[in-house]
From Swiss-Prot:
<protein>
    <recommendedName>
        <fullName>dCTP deaminase</fullName>
        <ecNumber>3.5.4.13</ecNumber>
    </recommendedName>
</protein>
<keyword id="KW-0547">Nucleotide-binding</keyword>
<feature type="binding site">
    <location>
        <begin position="136"/>
        <end position="138"/>
    </location>
    <ligand>
        <name>dCTP</name>
    </ligand>
</feature>
<comment type="similarity">
    <text>Belongs to the dCTP deaminase family.</text>
</comment>
<comment type="function">
    <text>Catalyzes the deamination of dCTP to dUTP.</text>
</comment>
<dbReference type="Pfam" id="PF22769">
    <property type="entry name" value="DCD"/>
</dbReference>
<dbReference type="GO" id="GO:0008829">
    <property type="term" value="F:dCTP deaminase activity"/>
</dbReference>
<keyword id="KW-0546">Nucleotide metabolism</keyword>
<dbReference type="GO" id="GO:0000166">
    <property type="term" value="F:nucleotide binding"/>
</dbReference>
<feature type="binding site">
    <location>
        <begin position="110"/>
        <end position="115"/>
    </location>
    <ligand>
        <name>dCTP</name>
    </ligand>
</feature>
<dbReference type="InterPro" id="IPR011962">
    <property type="entry name" value="dCTP_deaminase"/>
</dbReference>
<dbReference type="InterPro" id="IPR033704">
    <property type="entry name" value="dUTPase_trimeric"/>
</dbReference>
<dbReference type="GO" id="GO:0006226">
    <property type="term" value="P:dUMP biosynthetic process"/>
</dbReference>
<feature type="binding site">
    <location>
        <position position="171"/>
    </location>
    <ligand>
        <name>dCTP</name>
    </ligand>
</feature>
<feature type="binding site">
    <location>
        <position position="182"/>
    </location>
    <ligand>
        <name>dCTP</name>
    </ligand>
</feature>
<dbReference type="InterPro" id="IPR036157">
    <property type="entry name" value="dUTPase-like_sf"/>
</dbReference>
<feature type="binding site">
    <location>
        <position position="178"/>
    </location>
    <ligand>
        <name>dCTP</name>
    </ligand>
</feature>
Length: 194
């Protein structure tokens, strides 16, 4: 069952859900809590590789990922990140989110941004029970104009759904959890899938 705004506030107040810094009352409405854009980004370099073999040898995959991903870009206050049409970039939320083992989170982009062509998460919008960290966003500009993205702008909204019971294997206890406690725009760790 999705939590209402009343229950989101209740769960935040009693610490069952933690969002740091805590959202103001104005940031919680209906069934969501607003999240803002952080100041860390990562882009894809122009490259000449014909393809990236996602199931190939681990060392080759790591080498390919290193050649196509930029170092992390950290914006100073007042700076903007420009996402051009057809570009994919990674970013993080300003807020750190921590979920218990019996709640799953769902991140949705804002309709107002989607109407300008901005996809906030390409496919990964589930936030697993037991998650703790900033959320990495997979931005894609499907519009016709470059978009200026600034830290602290409202970027998405998160809803929360209670499970029938706590997970036996929440994210924070999994040995194979690749993005545990992330606080930066972490690139794909697909080579760790083995």
């Amino acid at each position: 069952m999705r939590l209402s705004d009343t229950h989101i506030k209740e769960y935040l107040n009693d610490g069952r859900i933690v969002i740091e810094p805590a959202p103001t009352d104005e940031m919680i409405s209906g069934v969501t809590a607003d999240l803002r854009l952080g100041n860390k980004f990562r882009t894809f370099h122009a490259h000449t590789a014909a393809y990236v073999d996602l199931s190939g040898p681990k060392d080759q995959l790591n080498k390919a990922m290193e050649s196509i991903m930029s170092d992390e870009i950290v914006l100073d206050e007042g700076e903007a990140f420009f996402l051009h049409p057809g570009e994919l970039a990674l970013a993080i939320t300003y807020e750190k989110v921590t979920l218990p083992a019996d709640i799953v989170g769902w991140l949705d982009g804002r309709s107002s941004l989607a109407r300008l062509g901005l996809m906030v998460h390409v496919t990964a919008h589930r936030i697993d029970p037991g998650w703790s960290g900033n959320i990495v966003l997979e931005f894609y500009n499907s519009g016709k104009l470059p978009l200026a993205l600034r830290p602290m702008m409202k970027i998405g909204a998160m809803s929360f759904e209670t499970l029938t019971g706590p997970c036996a294997n929440p994210y924070n206890t999994r040995k194979d959890a690749k993005y545990k406690d992330q606080n930066s725009a972490v690139a794909s760790r697909i080579s760790d899938d083995r």
